[in-house]
Regions:
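Cationic, low-complexity basic patches in intrinsically disordered or flexible, solvent-exposed regions
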Residues: 8
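Active-site neighborhoods and metal-handling regions in enzymes and metal-associated proteins
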Residues: 11, 19-437
Length: 437
């Protein structure tokens, strides 16, 4: 059984009511409603409960050491991370924004998450390092809390691919940096190489995805709705995650289960369409564990598969197997893509391919993250290295009205090893197992 890393910690502030204005740290502001109202702090520290993290403290210390090496090379005094993926990668805390800004400030000596008061002490319990809570009583208290750590007139590293124009202007006003440096590319390169601890978590995730896949397969029969099948897969995965990670927080796990024409797009939402005999199906399970994404994707048919569909399916499965064989150390992403393009062209189906052949894994979801430097596309020349984790997922979409119409996709997760790769996806692909119901 896997477990998250946790240790008891003393409560640094047991209640807000027991503290006088300003006792949490940071300036206070008189409310506009009159002097009889209690002054309210702009920020404070509220630390209580036991700290529980996805990884050991040493894992986060090592990540921060690598980051600080990058900061030193680029002459950065402090980094402000605002994206869910980088805040989680360097601190363990996966925030829930709900319209409020969140961040992580890293200096040469400090690592401090900045969170909203609505979360109370939960961000501290789930982060490595210090935590400051900002209040809603005055607009832009988030930026005042950030400035209390960074100071002014510093070289500030930030994520240009995440910071909005509005927030970028506020950074300039409140931090008054001497220079801003985009550090997003450097942090992405760091995230692309997975530590042993990360690979262990991803291995668990792949196994959970398989559990969801088998639960979905068991539900498939004529007359069942897509939503019914999807819920069965999602519930099975959430129960499995809770069994493997009893101290985790559970959020964001989902299923896309598509049938018939709904299979034409890889990211098409679930509907209430009822399954019919001969339908093409697309099974997609996505367990989320502490912000780490894994996936299983398979083509299936209800009851029977026609000759034209079987031909397209066989071609895509063959491309899938070829692609897996190409994912080895030293291979260039664009070269792998070119070889798979040639294979599809030989079979006269290249025109039915709609996106790349695979991508990196780690802290990402359908609304945060994505390590765009490690994708199997024509415009990515990254060379595969041991420690990288990447998918092989060719897809062909045959338009409605043509023989074999529908979307065909197989998806496995592979660890790049010293001498090849390891496929950690175990759910079978192909017609021998996936013509069901």
């Amino acid at each position: 059984m896997a477990s998250l890393q946790g240790k008891p910690a003393a409560c640094e502030a047991t209640s807000l009511s027991s503290c006088t204005p300003g006792s949490f740290g940071g300036p206070v502001r008189q409310t506009q409603m009159g002097s009889d109202m209690t002054d309210r702090p702009q920020q404070y520290r509220f630390h209580q409960g036991d700290r529980v993290l996805p990884f050991a403290a040493e894992e986060y210390d090592e990540r921060l050491d690598h980051l600080r090496d990058l900061m030193e090379v680029q002459g950065i005094d402090a980094c402000l991370f605002t994206s869910m993926h980088n805040v989680a990668y360097y601190s363990g805390f996966l925030y829930c924004s709900f319209g409020r800004p969140y961040g992580l400030v890293v200096t040469a000596t400090e690592s401090v998450t900045i969170s909203a008061g609505i979360d109370a002490s939960q961000p501290w319990r789930r982060c490595h390092g210090d935590n400051i809570t900002y209040t809603d009583w005055q607009r832009d208290n988030f930026w005042r809390a950030v400035a209390s750590v960074t100071g002014e007139d510093q070289v500030i590293g930030c994520e240009a691919d995440h910071l909005t124009l509005v927030q970028s202007e506020k950074l300039s006003v409140f931090l008054k940096p001497t220079r801003g440096v985009d550090i997003s590319a450097g942090t992405m390169l760091q995230r692309m190489i997975k530590s042993p601890a990360e690979r262990d978590l991803i291995r668990h995730g792949a196994a959970v995805a398989d559990v969801g896949g088998f639960a979905i397969r068991d539900m498939i029969r004529e007359g069942v709705r897509e939503i019914d099948v999807a819920m069965a897969g999602r519930d099975a995965m959430e129960l499995e995650i809770a069994k493997r990670f009893p101290d985790a927080e559970y959020r964001d796990t989902w299923v896309w289960f598509q049938s018939g024409i709904n299979t034409d797009g890889a990211h098409n939402p679930v509907t209430s369409r009822k399954l019919k005999r001969g339908d093409i199906l697309s099974l997609n399970t996505f367990p989320m564990i502490s912000g780490y994404y894994t996936a299983l994707e398979r083509t299936l048919f209800v009851g029977e598969v026609d000759v034209a569909s079987q031909r397209i399916w066989n071609i895509n499965v063959a491309a899938h197997e070829l692609g897996i064989s190409l994912l080895v150390p030293g291979a260039k992403c664009s070269d792998v893509t070119a070889q798979l393009n040639s294979f599809f062209e030989e079979h006269q189906v290249l025109q039915y391919r709609t996106f790349g052949y695979g991508h990196s894994f780690g802290i990402l979801s359908h609304y945060y993250g994505r390590e765009a430097g490690l994708e199997l596309r024509e415009d990515i020349d990254t060379v595969l290295e041991p420690g990288m984790v990447i998918s092989m997922e060719p897809m062909l979409t045959i338009p409605k009205g043509q023989p074999g119409a529908g979307g065909y996709r197989e998806h496995d997760i592979l660890f790049i090893t010293d001498d090849g790769n390891e496929d950690i996806t175990k759910y079978p692909y192909g017609a021998g197992f996936n013509v069901v119901g």
